[in-house]
A protein has these predicted regions:
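N-terminal transmembrane alpha-helices
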Residues: 1-34, 47-62, 66, 89-96, ...
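Short alpha-helical transmembrane segments in multi-pass integral membrane proteins
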Residues: 1-13, 67-130, 177-228, 285-352, ...
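Structural signal for membrane-spanning alpha-helices in multi-pass inner-membrane proteins
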Residues: 99, 142, 168, 172, ...
Length: 439
C-alpha cells in the first residue's frame, strides 16, 4: 500500500502543479509584456479562476469520490462520469454569457479602473467563454485518478501546462496577440489535458462507464456533498484575492495589489502541492473506507500528514532563503516599491502554510470517508469565514502586515475547529466503521 500511496500522491502533486502553471505562465509573460499593470489585472481576475475551478472541482472531484466509494461497495456507477460532465457544462453557461456580453462590467465589479479594464477585457472574455473546458477538466482527471490511472491524469495535466507555457510565448510575442494570446493559450490548455486522459478511457484498463442517464439533482447533490471541500479549497483563493485586493487597494494602491499578485501566484504552487497530496490520497482512502478497512484508512491518514509536515518545512526554507529571487521572476521592471511590499508579504503570508497544508489534508480525508459535515465546516472556515474576518480585523489593527498574517490566523482557527468536531463525533465514527466491517 505504501508504494501505491507514494505513486498516487507523487503523480497527483505533479499534476496539480501542472494545473497551477496555467496561471503562473500567464503571470510571468504578462509581467514581461505589461509590467505592474498587467500583474494588477491578472490578480483582479484570480477570483474568476477561483470560482470556475471551484465549481468544476466540486462536481468533478465530488462525483469521482462518490464513484470510488460506490464502486468499492459493488454499486452501479456506469452513469457517474457522463452526469459529471453534463452538470459541468450546464454550470458553465452563465460564465460564457458574461464573457460574451459583459466582460467590462465583470472587471469593474472586481475593482478594475478604466485603464485596467481596457488592458484585460479580451483576456477575461476568452477565459469565460472557455469555462466548459476548465470545469470538465476536473471530471476527466479526477475519474482517471479514482479509476487507478493517476499517471495518466498527471501526464495530461503536465502536457496541458507545457502547451500553455510554449503557446503563451508564441501567441503573445511572435504572433503579436498580447494579453489576448495569453488567454487563448490558457483556454486551450484543458483541452490538451482532457485529450490525454481520454487515452485511459479508451483503454482496456478503464472501468468508468459512459452510459447516458437523465441529469438528476439528487445524484448531483449526493456527489457535491463530497466535493464541497474541493469547492471551497479552490474558491478560497478567489475569495482571499477579492478581500485582499479591496483591503490592499485602500492601504497601498495598485502597487500593493501588484505585490499581492506576486504573493498570490506563488501561493498557487503551494496550494497545488497540498491539494495534490490530498487528492492523491483520497482515492485510496475512499477505496479502503468503502471496503470497511479502518486500519488501512488510519494508516493512509498518518502517511498523508507526515508528508504534509515535511513539505511545509521545505516550503518555509525556500521562502525564507530565496525571497527576493522568487519576487524577481515577476518583477521585470525591477520596481523597488513592488519588491519591498512583496518581500515582507511573501514571508508573512507563507507562515499560514504551516497550518494550511494540514487543514487541506484533514478536510479531504473527511470527504473521502463520507463525513461531509466536518469537511464542509472546515472548508468554509478556512476558505471564506475565518479568512475574511481575520483579514478585516487584522488590517485595521496592523495595516498591510495584518493582511499578510491573516492566513496564519484563519488556518489556526480552522485547525482547532476541525479537531473539536472530530473529537466530538468520534463515537459515531467508530460505530460506522464497525458496521462497514460487518457488511
Amino acid at each position: 500500500m505504501l508504494k501505491r500511496f507514494t505513486r498516487y500522491v507523487t503523480q497527483s502533486v505533479a499534476g496539480m502543479i501542472g494545473i497551477s502553471v496555467y496561471v503562473l505562465a500567464d503571470t510571468f509573460f504578462i509581467s514581461v509584456y505589461s509590467g505592474a499593470d498587467g500583474l494588477a489585472v491578472l490578480n483582479l481576475i484570480l477570483p474568476v479562476y477561483g470560482l470556475i475551478y471551484a465549481i468544476g472541482a466540486m462536481i468533478g472531484i465530488g462525483s469521482a469520490t462518490r464513484y470510488a466509494i460506490s464502486r468499492a461497495k459493488g454499486k452501479n456507477t456506469e452513469h457517474y462520469f457522463v452526469q459529471s460532465v453534463t452538470w459541468s457544462i450546464l454550470a458553465a453557461v452563465p460564465f460564457m454569457l458574461i464573457g460574451i456580453f459583459i466582460p467590462d462590467k465583470a472587471l469593474a465589479l472586481l475593482g478594475a479602473d478604466a485603464g485596467l479594464i481596457g488592458l484585460g477585457r479580451n483576456y477575461v472574455r476568452i477565459i469565460l467563454i472557455a469555462t466548459p473546458f476548465f470545469m470538465s477538466n476536473y471530471t476527466f482527471t479526477a475519474f482517471a485518478r479514482n479509476d487507478g490511472a493517476p499517471s495518466v491524469a498527471m501526464i495530461g495535466s503536465i502536457s496541458g501546462s507545457i502547451f500553455n507555457i510554449i503557446f503563451d510565448y508564441i501567441f503573445m510575442f511572435p504572433v503579436g496577440l498580447g494579453f489576448s494570446g495569453a488567454g487563448l493559450a490558457t483556454a486551450i490548455c484543458p483541452i490538451v489535458t482532457m485529450s490525454v486522459c481520454t487515452i485511459h478511457y479508451r483503454s482496456s484498463r478503464n472501468h468508468v462507464g459512459f452510459h447516458w442517464k437523465k441529469p438528476s439533482f439528487r445524484h448531483l447533490i449526493s456527489c457535491c456533498q463530497l466535493g464541497v471541500s474541493a469547492f471551497v479549497g479552490e474558491l478560497s483563493s478567489g475569495v482571499i484575492a477579492i478581500v485582499f485586493n479591496f483591503l490592499i487597494l485602500g492601504i497601498a494602491g495598485n502597487m500593493g495589489v501588484a505585490a499581492y499578485g506576486v504573493v498570490a501566484n506563488l501561493s498557487i504552487v503551494a496550494f497545488a502541492i497540498f491539494n495534490g497530496l490530498a487528492q492523491g490520497a483520497q482515492p485510496l482512502i475512499s477505496e479502503s473506507y468503502g471496503k470497511g478497512q479502518p486500519t488501512q484508512v488510519r494508516k493512509l491518514l498518518k502517511w498523508s500528514l507526515f508528508v504534509c509536515l515535511a513539505v511545509e518545512a521545505l516550503i518555509q526554507l525556500i521562502i525564507w532563503t530565496s525571497t527576493d529571487t522568487l519576487i524577481s521572476i515577476f518583477n521585470s521592471e525591477n520596481n523597488v516599491q513592488l519588491l519591498n511590499y512583496a518581500h515582507i508579504g511573501l514571508r508573512l503570508y507563507f507562515l499560514g502554510f504551516i497550518v494550511a497544508g494540514i487543514n487541506i489534508v484533514l478536510v479531504a480525508y473527511f470527504s473521502a470517508v463520507d463525513e461531509p459535515k466536518i469537511a464542509i465546516v472546515g472548508s468554509f472556515l478556512r476558505g471564506i469565514v475565518a479568512i475574511v474576518i481575520c483579514a478585516v480585523i487584522l488590517a485595521k489593527l496592523f495595516g498591510l502586515n495584518g493582511i499578510w498574517i491573516s492566513l496564519l490566523a484563519a488556518e489556526t482557527v480552522t485547525f482547532l475547529t476541525i479537531l473539536f468536531l472530530a473529537y466530538k463525533d468520534r463515537r459515531k465514527r467508530i460505530k460506522r466503521y464497525c458496521s462497514l466491517r460487518s457488511q
